[in-house]
Structure formats: structure tokens, C-alpha cells
Amino acid sequence: MKKRISVREGNSGILHIRHEDATEERHIPSYDLDEARHLLLRFQELRDGEGSYLKDNYWCEGTNWLPTVVNYLYGRIFGNYVRYRPLLKQLIDGELEVALENQGELATIVDILEGQGDGRFLKPHLFNGLMLFNNWLTVRRYRAEVLFFRFTPDDFRTTAAKSTLDELGVRYMEALGVSKRLLLTNVFRRKPYYFYGGVPIENSFGLDYDLSGVDKYTAVLFTAALRRIEWMISAYIREQKWHVRALNSSEFKTFYGIDDTQVIFPLLYACQQQQIHTVAHQHGAAYNKYHASYVMEGINGTEYRWFDKLITWGEFWRDRLLAVSEVYSPDRIVVGCDLFEPRHVSRNERTEGRRNILIPYEYLANTYAVGRYITKLMDLGYSVFFKQRPDESLEDQIDTYCLPIGYPERLTIIEEITPRAMENIDIVAGTASTLIYQLLIYGKVTWFLETDYKYMEDLVELGHARLVRYEDLETLDDSYFEPTDADPKYLFSSETLRDTLQKHVLAGEA
């Protein structure tokens, strides 16, 4: 008999499940990044009836489009399948019926497995036509020298860059991810917004591959993944052509934005076709072996097109990217300023005997496991400081850690990192946040908390953090409280954001 459950997903992917008999349980996802990587590589190596590899079958007009969906495959499809595999197997077997109370990562993978979302949209031709018309009209009405890529009008990742461009008096136009609301609003309250991200209309490929070597669950997964990415690639190819037409009469000299590896390819390739110089700016600590779309494992470097130039925060990041991937040319990677403002600070000595530990919110991490660390640290007498993220509600962020009653109230909330706030901190700990790297310059004790989410374990491998296990918290010796010895100048350039933009964004191809 088919079971029926109702599921609410928390911000970090933890599922709150309610059964038909009103009992409730919590499902903690699996965060096995190695398994997601294994599925990605196996998928890329599938062969069609003629023996051609899947990764070689999506060329169009001189471009291999398969790399444009690697991020989606790894994170949204294979990563989510690994996260929720026990439930998804029951779903595939027809033993489970799921009512989703909200949209999240489970909803994404369920839709993919059920073939939902492939070309389903209210009047897609009309929507795409409106986007194309908006872009064509905007380019002609508003002249600008820089096309500035952002996810949304209030994207915190690019706030500092936007302010600096304003201070420099640069004529720029924002390129934003399209949505029905934003597009329709802009039709009537016209702003100089250029949109990217059209709606899929049809699958131009429909290729078949040999799945005889995989189990039935993997076969279902690969079939669904194939269907989804073929829709995406088909849409990307069409979107690129729309952008080429819209940009025909533009005056853009430079296309600039964060180092995205998913949504930006159609506009990026169109800019390159129109001889517009393209520059990416590092936005996070993603240059490690577990970020598939920066590593591009199994992809030939000569077949991967990305930005003409990449600005990294420091020599450390340039070296890391070149160490974990073979698809990048060293002469296209330069060192500039951190997108989140310069971070050179004076270090202060740790106060003897004080146990103030800073743990930042990490929505991609195993927050349940980190919550156990927080609880035990409090029980051991540590004062836990929690750095909240600016784009989610504080209550929702804390809720992801599943803390016992009474423990959330004991957290000291930090809204913004400042030198003064860091004077109160002795230890910085986490598993996945860019902030852990950014705080190395303060010379604090740095801990990498052991969980099944190993995204930033290179912190330990490079000697920038101590690996701390939950079962060892009560018996840590003095070596665990030695401050981190990392060279701030190697991690983060002393150059200002203003100088970086003038040198690498506003100076053409220099």
C-alpha cells in the first residue's frame, strides 16, 4: 500500500515529515559530495549507440554546451539525489506519495524525476518575446559602456562593486535574472535593466544513451537528468542568439560580474561573439576540489569557454584554482580586490581562558550536525556567537540547526563583521562558509568541524585550520587553541576595489 507523507523543507534542506497517522519525523540529508561527483563523472561518460560520449554530444556552432550545465547536474540533480535517496527510491518504486508544503531542493529533484518543468510555462513564446523586446529597447534607449551582471537588483554579492562603479561615474547597465514580476514591472516602470534567462520551449536534441550498466534507480535518475539538461541547453542556445541580436547596436565595451558557472553562459557567449570584453570577479571560496563547475573534471580545457579574464581576491585563490583544475589558462587569471571590501586588519591577542567561538550561518552545510556541535560547546562553557546572513530571516537560519529548547536564546547574534566585533572572538569554526576564509586574516584559532559535508576540508589540508571531531570536544589539548598562521597578503590583495575595477574592468582588455 502506498504511503502518503507531507513534507516541509527547512532552509538548509532538512525535511520535516508528517505521516498520515499525524506522527512526525525529521530527515537529515546525506551530504556525500564524493558520491555526487561519482554520479556526475559516470553520467558524462555515458555512450550513445555510435559509441560517442555524452560529454562530446552537445556541440553547436563551435561551442561545447555540456559544461554550461555541469553546475546544475552536480548540485541540483546528483547532489539532491544523494541528499534524499531513501525517499526518492520509494518514490521511484511507487511506494510513496509526497505532498510538498514548500519549494526547496526536494521539490526540485522530485520535479526533475517526474519530468515536470520541462517546457511548462504560461505562454513561453510571449514571455521570451517580452524579454527580447525589453533588451532591444533598453540597449537603444540607455547608452552604457559596461554591462554589469547581477542576480537581482539587491544582490548583496555585488553591492560594493555597484557603489564603486557609481563613485567612478561609470555608465553601466545592470543585467539581471529575469522573472515574470520583474519583467512586467519593467515594462511599465522602465529602468535600464537588461535581462537574461529565457524560458525553455522545446528540446532540440532527444539523444539516447546506453544505461544497461547501471541499476534501475540510477537509470531513472540519468534519464531524467538527460531530459532536463537537453531542455536547458536548447534554451541556452536560443537565448544566446537573442542576446546577439539585442547587443548588435550596443556601446558596451565590457561585460563584468561575478564568476558564475550556471546562468550566465548564453549572455557571456553573446558578448564574446560581439567582441565585448568579459571579466569575472571571484565571489566566494569555491575554488576547491568539491566544486564541480570550477574543476570541470573530465572536460577538455580547450573545449570550455568562460570569461576572458578572472579577478581573484589574492594570489592564494589564483593558485588554488590552477591547482584543482586543468581547464584555465594562467594568463587569464589576475589578482585584485575582495568584492566585500579590503580585509587587512590588525591582529589582537587571544584573551587567556576566554572561550568565545564564532560560527557563521552555512545554508549548504549539514546544519543538524553543526547544531550538535553548538549545543555541546555551550554545555562545555563556550559562548557561541552566530553570524547571520543578510538575505534570510534570522529565525529561519537558527531553526536549521535544530537546537534544543533554550539554546537558541543563548546565541549572541552578529549582524556584521567588524574589527571591533572580532576583538570578542577567540575561535572561528565552520564547515562551508566563505567567511571562514575571510576571517583567517584576524589570526584567530580556526576549526573545521567534522561532518559528512567536506566542502572546505582543504582548510585543514593547507594548514589553515584544525580538524575538530564532535567526540573530542571535551578533551582538546593546547594545540587546538593555537592561532592560525596564514599570510593575509597572500590570501587577500591590498589593492582597493576602485583600483581593481579601473585596472581590469574599465581599461578594456589591458
Regions found by a protein language model. Name each.
Residues 1-510:
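Catalytic-core helical/loop segments in enzymes performing group transfer/polymerization on anionic/lipid-linked
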